[in-house]
Amino acid sequence: MRSVHSLPGHDEPQVVEVPTPQAAPAQVLIETLAAAVNPVDVFVATGAGRGAVNAGDRLGLGWDVSGRVLAVGDQVTTIAVGDVVAGVDDVMVGENRAQADLVLLDADAVAVVPDGLDPVDAASIPLNSLTAAQAVDLLGDPDGRTLLVTGAGGAVGGYAVALARSAGWTVTGLGRPGDEEFVRSTGADFTADAERAAYDAVLDGAVLQQEGLAFIRDGGTFVGVQPSAPVPTERGITVTAVKVVRDASRLAELLDRSVTGELAVRVAGTAPLADAATVYAKVGSGGQRGRWLLVP
């Protein structure tokens, strides 16, 4: 089968032939319908990115996948052969990951795609929606508090705006002027130029890092999305960062909320798996709204 890898000596992804995997007792084997390409994939595909994650000779790429279950391990009771599922590979370093013809995932990392959700589009949801949901959890009690979501037009930021609103936060999205219509469609306020020290909390979808603290009142809360690059605290601000972890029940809920329209499903485009390098170049150029998907 084919798998997208980062290889030594290459700064773009390589599509290579690898053996067909076999499901372990707690795993499911998925025939891929689509796999998303995220900015983190583009970073890891480069020499600098490989070094940052201590990659070996072969490093599989991809976090999100949707597809049909071909086989299940003998300990799996929640997923059946034939189910159409979406899932997240939350192990940063692995020889074969989500961008492949066939994908192995632990059963607790996948959820059945609900009726009404396009199975291909479902591949755009797991990583970014789970990251946003778990980041909102870290913000604490929303009662009477204001939140600025940076990068509100992006994938994590867009989900975070909607999820924080539904959790009870008074939300303002910070983004480009072209993002205003999308952000306001969630019921949140929008700004392209946020006021300093005006918010109780910041969820940093744009990865502003230290710069993002400037928008927070003394004693507020900052939640970042780069756990490997901690932000030094100041002015009594509580600083933390989300490290996404698999959560099948939460993913099922997020997929359901995508069907109802509460969470927007945004796909920038699809391309064959063989054209991974072209898609990586598009994602690496920045400014994408929605995820590019690789299809076998």
Predicted feature locations:
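NAD(P)H dinucleotide-binding glycine-rich loop of Rossmann-like/cofactor-binding domains
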Residues: 78, 87-151
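Glycine-rich beta-strand-centered segment in the early N-terminal region that forms part
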Residues: 19-37, 49-91
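Mid-domain Rossmann-like dinucleotide-binding core that forms the NAD(H)/NADP(H) cofactor-binding site
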Residues: 123-193
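Local beta-strand N-terminus motif with an aromatic residue
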Residues: 100, 144, 188, 198-200, ...
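C-terminal hydrophobic helical "lid"/dimerization subdomain
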Residues: 251-296
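Residue-level marker of beta-strand positions
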Residues: 64, 83-84, 102, 146, ...
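Glycine-rich cofactor phosphate-binding loops and adjacent beta1-alpha1 units
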Residues: 172, 182-240
